């Protein structure tokens, strides 16, 4: 599974990273681990999954985490987009 995380601000990509998850974990564990890896690389707290994030991810294999998902942390960008590239 390949997962892409990118940080966007004012319709411009500031940073991106691709994570490859080849472990025998469940799909859900791979997704959560990839999000942790991406956030750790940028020294961010791991965002919480709101209902809209879960719904978008289930439907489109992509979601955006905005300021409301980063509890107790002020972010310097508009959103973190998280997307499955290949399963």
Predicted regions and their residues:
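Short, extreme N-terminal segment that most often corresponds to the first beta-strand
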Residues: 1-18
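General helical secondary-structure elements
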Residues: 8, 26, 57-60
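Generic structural motif
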Residues: 10, 22, 85-87
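Short, flexible N-terminal segments of the mature chain
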Residues: 13-41
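Acidic, low-complexity intrinsically disordered segments
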Residues: 34-87
């Amino acid at each position: 599974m390949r997962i892409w995380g990118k940080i966007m601000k004012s319709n411009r990509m500031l940073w991106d990273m691709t994570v490859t998850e080849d472990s025998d974990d469940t799909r859900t564990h791979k997704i959560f681990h990839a999000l942790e890896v991406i956030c750790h690389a940028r020294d961010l707290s791991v965002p919480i999954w709101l209902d809209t994030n879960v719904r978008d991810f289930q439907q489109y294999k992509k979601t955006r985490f905005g300021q409301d998902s980063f509890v107790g942390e002020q972010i310097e960008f508009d959103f973190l987009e998280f997307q499955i590239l290949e399963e």
